[in-house]
Structure formats: C-alpha cells, structure tokens
C-alpha cells in the first residue's frame, strides 16, 4: 500500500475527486495491490459515502461498517489510523501469532471469536497501539510464519504454547 499511496493521493486529493474516478483511472494505482476491480468498487462506494457525509470520516465502527465494502478489519484500521483509537488489526496473521502464543481460538471464523478479540485488544491497547499492530503483523510475516515458523529466532518462544508443544510434545 505504501508504494501507491503518494501517487494515489496526488491523483485523488479529495473524496470528491475520487467519486469522479472510473475503474480505468484507478486500475494503474490499484493493480499492484491485487484485486483491483473489487477495491475500485469499494473505494468508489466509500468516496460517495464520505462526500454524502460532508467529507468527515465516521468515528464509530457501526457507522463505518454501514458502508458496503467496509468490514471489521477495515473499520478497525480506519479507527486506528485516522482517529487514533486503540483497535487491533485482527487478521489471519495476527490471529496466528496470538493462537500460537496463548492457545487455540474458540471459533472457526476469527471475526466471530470473542476469545481472540479479547486477546488482540489486550495486546494492542497501549499508547503506541499503531506501532504494536504493525510490529505484530511484521513479526507474523518474518518470524511466526504460517509455514515453517522460525521459532528458534523468536524472542518469546520460551513462553509460547506452540513452541513448547512442537519441541516437547506437551
């Protein structure tokens, strides 16, 4: 996302400018991120909702999730980045880190798991919650990988349930 942000903001400096964009206008900026057609539609709906709301980004999860295309993860990201709320960016990567360290989740779908949400909130609710979120996501990508995690390089493996089970069988 960082690699297209500046070009995107230069091309579409306001919600109004974005409402006038066609999928063809958005394609070169969104294609490198994948799923550009889906994202183009979502961006268009969000831009129209923002213009209709006077340009203010909603500050509540309920208001944000009323916009078609904005779900739990995106609303949490907006609340965290735009409004400074201490929200966890709970995706499959963060869920993997939390599950491995603390223990298995209680529900199949991470979006509906109160245990996982409580853990995520506990971990990221700090004065520097944005940095904590990014650190966990980076950690998931670099150390606590989905396949072949680098447990020996993990700074917290001594207390990690996944590590203990993998290395002791308990």
Residue ranges and their predicted role:
Residues 1-169:
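Catalytic cores of DNA base-excision repair glycosylases
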């Amino acid at each position: 996302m960082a690699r297209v942000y500046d070009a995107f903001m230069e091309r579409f400096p306001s919600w109004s400018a974005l409402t006038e964009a066609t999928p063809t206008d958005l394609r070169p900026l969104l294609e490198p991120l994948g799923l550009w057609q889906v994202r183009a539609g979502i961006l268009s709906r969000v831009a129209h909702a923002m213009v209709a709301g006077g340009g203010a980004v909603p500050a509540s999860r309920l208001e944000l999730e009323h916009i078609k295309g904005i779900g739990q993860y995106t609303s949490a990201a907006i609340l965290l980045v735009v409004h400074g709320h201490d929200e966890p960016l709970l995706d499959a990567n963060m869920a993997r880190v939390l599950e491995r360290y603390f223990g298995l989740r209680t529900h199949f779908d991470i979006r509906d798991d109160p245990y996982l949400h409580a853990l995520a909130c506990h971990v990221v609710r700090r004065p520097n919650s944005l940095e904590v979120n990014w650190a966990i996501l980076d950690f998931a990508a670099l150390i606590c990988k989905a396949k072949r995690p680098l447990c020996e390089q993990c700074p917290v493996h001594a207390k990690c349930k996944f590590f203990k089970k993998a290395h002791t069988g308990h």
